[in-house]
Regions:
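Hydrophobic helical membrane-anchoring modules
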Residues: 2-6, 178, 182-313
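Acidic helix N-cap motif at the loop->helix transition within catalytic regions
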Residues: 21-25, 52-61
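Cell-envelope/extracellular polymer assembly enzymes that use nucleotide-activated donors
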Residues: 9-11, 42
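Acceptor/aglycone-binding surface of glycosyltransferases and processive sugar-polymer synthases
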Residues: 60, 71-75, 79-89, 94-97, ...
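Donor nucleotide-sugar binding loop of glycosyltransferases
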Residues: 19-22, 50, 79, 105
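Short, well-formed alpha-helical segments that are part of the catalytic scaffolds
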Residues: 19-34
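A conserved acidic beta->alpha catalytic loop
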Residues: 47-56, 102-103
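Short beta-strand/loop segment that forms part of the nucleotide-sugar
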Residues: 39-50, 71-72
Length: 313
């Protein structure tokens, strides 16, 4: 059987951007943890457009690490793109994701897999004692609090890179933009069983963190996208219709007021407030029309494509 067709028990997917200094040690630790488990496994490193010679090192490391596979991007496409490519190439029944900076401990892999064996489909790590700078810790806590309260999925650490997935989960998820932050939420909405366990978090040994304020802001914007897609996917008219009705009600109220003024006074001049009422009614009609068009688009697609079937007889 060709290598590309061989199934594995376990795939480890590692997005890497300018993490050359940590790659050799990370692979050594992974082999040391996984080999005693007696599992067939592969390690897929996605070089996300690194400028530090990571790909050259990965070519060398393939000679001493038979389980290693790597993909080199032409440029930096982001963590979501790296995970999507890794998921598409994974052959394992279980897929582990982790960061390449040695802050995620490979020794946690058996615990993650044991939790999957309890019947869960996705197990997310919870960095209970983070070894990150104060600003990164604070923004991460705020992000996780807002996400947990908005989404209805109670997790402490949505963005932990260390996660375990059943293969059917990675095959079902669409990862793009900054959606890697919300994979537990997306899986939960699709009906998969999601949980978390505390994991050790190590101080960064090499390089610099890729965290920035823009990533936090982008993540919050993507949260609105996720909430809209998960809650209004099957009936977008409910969302656009409510917005349209709100504008329409306000605009109609203004126009009715001026109608009674006209009845009472017998004359009515064109006033800015009346123009606002007319404009609000037109905006309401546009929102409702947009909702109807979105409904037609949803109806034209296979509406069962997002339904996950656990079993059938």
């Amino acid at each position: 059987m060709a290598e590309s067709a061989q199934k594995k028990d376990l795939t480890v997917v590692i997005p890497a951007y300018d993490e050359r200094e940590s790659l050799a040690e990370l692979l050594r630790r992974l082999d040391a943890v996984i080999q005693p488990l007696g599992l067939s496994y592969e390690i897929i490193v996605i070089d996300d457009g690194s400028n530090d010679g990571s790909s050259e090192l990965l070519r060398e490391l393939r000679g001493t690490h038979p389980a290693l596979r790597y993909v080199e991007f032409q440029r930096n496409f982001g963590k979501s793109a790296a995970l999507a490519v890794g998921f598409a190439r994974a052959r394992g029944d279980v897929v582990i994701t982790m960061d390449a900076d040695l802050q995620d401990d490979p020794a946690e892999i058996p615990s993650l897999m044991a939790k999957l064996d309890e019947g869960f489909d996705l197990v997310s790590g919870w960095k209970k004692e983070r070894k990150d700078p104060f600003i990164k810790n604070s923004t991460s806590k705020l992000f996780n609090l807002v996400t947990s309260m908005s989404a209805g999925l109670r997790l402490h650490d949505f963005n932990c890179g260390l996660k375990a997935y059943r293969r059917e989960v990675t095959e079902s998820l669409r990862v793009y933009g900054e959606m890697h932050r919300y994979l537990p939420l997306l899986a939960h909405v699709m009906g998969f069983r999601v949980t978390e366990i505390p994991v050790r978090h190590q101080p960064r040994q090499f390089g610099e963190t890729k965290f920035g304020r823009s990533r936090f802001l982008n993540g919050m914007l993507d949260l609105f996208t996720v909430l809209f897609l998960t809650r209004q996917r099957s009936s977008p008219l409910h969302f656009f219709g409510r917005v349209g009705l709100a504008f329409g009600t306000l605009g109609s109220g203004i126009c009715l007021y001026f109608f009674w003024v006209w009845i009472d006074a017998g004359a009515l001049r064109l006033r800015p407030l009346l123009l606002l009422g007319i404009a609000l009614i037109l905006v309401a009609l546009q929102f409702i029309s947009l909702g109807l068009l979105a409904e037609l688009f949803v109806a034209s697609r296979d509406n069962q494509s997002h339904i996950q079937i656990r079993s059938e007889g």
